[in-house]
Amino acid sequence: MTARRILVTSALPYANGQIHIGHLVEYIQTDIWVRFQRMMGNEVYYVGADDTHGTPVMLRAEKEGITPKALIDRVWTEHKRDFDSFLVSFDNYYSTDAEENRELCEKIYLALKAEDLIAEREVEQFFDPVKNMFLPDRFIKGECPKCGAKDQYGDSCEVCGTTYVPTDLKNPYSVVSGATPVRKSSAHYFFKLSDPRCETFLREWVADLAQPEAANKMQEWLGAEGEASTLSDWDISRDAPYFGFEIPGAPGKYFYVWLDAPIGYYASFQNLAAKKGIDFDAWVGPHSTAEQYHFIGKDILYFHTLFWPAMLRFSGYRTPTNVFAHGFLTVDGAKMSKSRGTFITAQSYVDTGMNPEWLRYYFAAKLNASMEDLDLNLDDFIARVNSDLIGKYVNIASRAAGFLVKRFEGKVDEAALAHPLLEQLRQAAPQVAHLYEAREYSKALRLVMELTDAVNAFVDTEKPWELAKDENKRAALHAACSVSLEAFRLLTVYLKPVVPNVAAGVERFLNVEPLDWRAIDKQLSAASPVQAYQHLMTRVDAKQVDALLAANRESLQATAAPAAAGAAIEPIADTITIDDFAKVDLRVAKIVECQKVEGSNKLLQLTLDLGEGRTRNVFSGIQSAYTPEQLVGKLTVVVANLAPRKMKFGVSEGMVLAASAADEKATPGLYILEPHEGAVPGMRIG
């Protein structure tokens, strides 16, 4: 079979924070697939980089009193350390702030311009008069122009789900300085995604997407064929001051970070190609026969399935073979939380003494090819790792290796290796390979654990510890241990993409060459004696998990410290009279039912009891902070006399009160109000 040529990427982590376990879902998912492809003998390159440009990096560097370059260099070192700790096997890990990326950005931009796909337009934006800078969407907050909810970002309302432009906000303020922004016009550059050529191409390209959810989402964005295009042109420029690449021929204008970030995939590969003598153009040119896959989170599907392929298609590059999106991570059924200690950083996991392969295995046991979210249930994590990896898999070697080394000098009984159990394991190879290829890791590991159960059943039946007591059963002992260790070798082949360090330990003690998929058709040889068994993995101790949570838990005092130090908060509203306040009817309400709103990643639909003899329907933009299961049965506070509002999902008959920080990036979290014990539905608050 001819080896496939495959270029693989994961989304680029932003150079403004630490790697946490939510990030690791994607990198572990990608790495397992890449390691499997290498084991299959394919030529595969896995490249990544830090996403380094943009306003947040610039402002953080300013806050720390260092240059943006010093900041991104430090963060790169931290990110690379974390990826190495979790065995993420990049062939090249680079930075978007690299000369290769600058040149590629300029080349792609000029090619799109030559195709008449770049337009210059005047754009009115908010400008911070204190910081003397234009404000990106997420650095402006104010009141929603539709429902009036306060403290909403400049692009969308988390309460009613409305999207808008920043200049639509009422009473806006700068998250950076707290100042009231002014409106200013500026020339911006747009990629003309609405061009009929882009629409025609994207309708053809979407047909090859592997994930139905992604294809359906793209069809939703593209709209019905034959109707007017629903695609909007994309603003690819930002005004100085900005940390990034200046646009050719446009002084003071910079490429938007979301333009240069995906191009960073190619920049990293070009850097690798120069070092290894790879023909870069043969891999990424328009006639390339190589495969190209992007693993991403579902929140950035829009950029990777609309802008990125269209940019590549019309600038003279090949387009992605496919884009694979995954869901979000929750911990114990809830969004990761600093106060609960479940916002777990990669470094804290390692520092606590936790084995990275425990997490690799657990994530793999939960991952499939869909975009559904996955949950890290800590009790299940302990139980599954201890049961599957230690109790089932590692236990096979520990039960057989000692006898073989002590009684038979480590030499297997080759004649015994014709056992039907081993043929059963080998026959599973095509199915295991298919499941890895399809990214159905949970199914692959379920199958491998079924095979592991069969091997343990064999060991339990043969009872080598009993055979060892009777010298007349020496041959049976030799055969049982030989079959057990050969079975263990085959199981290790199947598990190697997930637990590569354990596999390396197995290779050493079994005295075999590095295992690849072809090793399934080989077997242990008496000419290469098995070495003394070395411990491969320890059990998870619940105390370690407790220590991990404690290490990541922030006290309320620590969380509040930035505000005390003078961080920007929403300005206090104008003074009102007691009569004004009396117009707002705040009531205690019980959450009777709660469910996610189909088609929205922000809203929850709540059924509330206000003691009126009927229930009310209320939509609330708190899905990022709570699961429906967490809210049912709780008491909360509602604006009861708010006029009903018709939304595309239904009518909302009130507003649930929730608190959040002015800068949710710096201090993430939404918190609904809960009355103390004793309050009952219908009580008025005043």
Curated annotation (Swiss-Prot):
Q: Which domain of life is it from?
A: Bacteria
Q: Where does ATP bind?
A: K338
The compartments listed are: Cytoplasm
Native species? Cupriavidus necator (strain ATCC 17699 / DSM 428 / KCTC 22496 / NCIMB 10442 / H16 / Stanier 337) (Ralstonia eutropha)
Q: What class of enzyme is it?
A: ligase
Molecular function GO terms recorded: ATP binding; metal ion binding; methionine-tRNA ligase activity; tRNA binding
**What are the tRNA-binding domain coordinates in residue numbering?**
580-686
Role summary: Is required not only for elongation of protein synthesis but also for the initiation of all mRNA translation through initiator tRNA(fMet) aminoacylation.
Report the HAMAP family cross-referenced here: Met_tRNA_synth_type1
User: Which residues are listed for Zn(2+) binding in this entry?
Assistant: C144, C147, C157, C160
List each coiled-coil range: none
List the ranges annotated as motif 'KMSKS' region: 335-339
Asked whether the keyword Cytoplasm is assigned, the reply is yes
Its needed co-factors are: Zn(2+)
Give the protein's recorded name.
Answer: Methionine--tRNA ligase
| Gene behind the chain | metG
Query: What Pfam families would the database entry show?
Result: Anticodon_3, tRNA-synt_1g, tRNA_bind
Q: Where is this motif: 'HIGH' region?
A: 13-23
Similarity comment? Belongs to the class-I aminoacyl-tRNA synthetase family. MetG type 1 subfamily.
Manner of cofactor binding, per the entry note: Binds 1 zinc ion per subunit.
GO CC entries? cytosol
Biological process (GO) annotations held by this record are: methionyl-tRNA aminoacylation
